[in-house]
């Protein structure tokens, strides 16, 4: 049933939130993986013994994609063709998806840049490893902030249509 508070198009915004969460977070994860992978490939030719330690940025980039998956599944779980879906919920889900997705892009970019340069520096100087991991953790937390905000937003939905 369509009303002013629950128009027929309100689910579009919810689905846009699902899409934004997945697309942007995976874009960030893919970029971070590609950049860090390029550095690992360059290092592996000179010091193959440090390749396994150098995989940390790639793993951390992959976690950014998982944040987007979690948010997308939660948003999609709130949507059903059998139940009313308010415009308020649509906007909340869109903002939650954008919060997770866009912080995922920022975190993925930061992880990729730090991972690429950090791994190359680690090849030359072993003491760099701890500093690189600390900076990677701070970059990963950017994506985690978005997930936390998205989860808080997602709990505020309301499908009251009267």
Curated annotation (Swiss-Prot):
Pfam families: ATP-synt_C. It is found in: Vacuole membrane. Residues 1-11, 76-93, 154-162 are lumenal. GO terms for biological process: proton transmembrane transport. NCBIfam families: V_ATP_synt_C. V-ATPase is a heteromultimeric enzyme composed of a peripheral catalytic V1 complex (components A to H) attached to an integral membrane V0 proton pore complex (components: a, c, c', c'', d, e, f and VOA1). The decameric c-ring forms the proton-conducting pore, and is composed of eight proteolipid subunits c, one subunit c' and one subunit c''. Proton-conducting pore forming subunit of the V0 complex of vacuolar(H+)-ATPase (V-ATPase), a multisubunit enzyme composed of a peripheral complex (V1) that hydrolyzes ATP and a membrane integral complex (V0) that translocates protons. V-ATPase is responsible for acidifying and maintaining the pH of intracellular compartments. This is V-type proton ATPase subunit c'. The gene is vma11.
